[in-house]
Amino acid sequence: MSDAKQNTPTKALVVFSGGQDSTTCLIQALSQYDEVHGITFDYGQRHRQEIEVAKSLATELKLASHKVMDTTLLNELAISALTRDAIPVSHELMNNGLPNTFVPGRNILFLTLAGIYAYQLGCDAIITGVCETDFSGYPDCRNEFVQSMQNSLALGMDKPLKIITPLMWLNKAETWALADKYQQLALVQHQTLTCYNGIVGKGCGDCPACVLRQRGLDDYLQNSQSVMDSLNSKL
């Protein structure tokens, strides 16, 4: 969708964690839709400070509404470094080839609940910041999975609800460029929470999420024009 809003009023629901990716998607959505809502999930996550960050950003960015939904049942079912404070976040993959920060079923649940809520709100689209290019080995960040969920929601609710993934084919440097394109680089850099240890902005600098975030930012700042050109070629 182009940045020019359409003549027919449009609504979107953003799956919004308060992190870099979802905040960037939210910023873009505000320029593309007449009405933007946010939904944040509280699943007892290790970095649960992100919920307060999401609330603050939702107010600052003037969302039409922002819902925080209790999904702590997921914490009981899914054992992960993100749902158990006693499990240290590891840089090594588990025996199944996945990082120990993978939360089984998380995006299945989140997109299902977002679909139900979007139906209630009358939204045209759900927007989520999952990414296959820079994804951390999570199977529920793949485009194939997202398309499958979109088809299931449309069939199950008899409504052509789209799941839009603006970052799916962007690398992390291009995601930073997208925030800069909307003049919100500083906000995303200093006010979002990506860190698995719950530290706002630059984060702990050590967990996998922080390493990926900082590497992308360094790449963008050192090669801003070429990265922006690459981003624009994908939009």
From Swiss-Prot:
Q: What is written in the cofactor note of this entry?
A: Binds 1 zinc ion per subunit.
**Cofactor section:** Zn(2+)
Does Iron show up as a keyword for this record?
Answer: no
Name a single GO biological process: queuosine biosynthetic process
Pfam families xrefs: QueC
The protein's superkingdom reads: Bacteria
Which transformation does this protein catalyse, written as a reaction? 7-carboxy-7-deazaguanine + NH4(+) + ATP = 7-cyano-7-deazaguanine + ADP + phosphate + H2O + H(+)
Protein name, UniProt field: 7-cyano-7-deazaguanine synthase
Q: What is the originating organism of this protein?
A: Shewanella frigidimarina (strain NCIMB 400)
What are the top taxonomic ranks of the organism?
A: Bacteria, Pseudomonadati, Pseudomonadota, Gammaproteobacteria, Alteromonadales
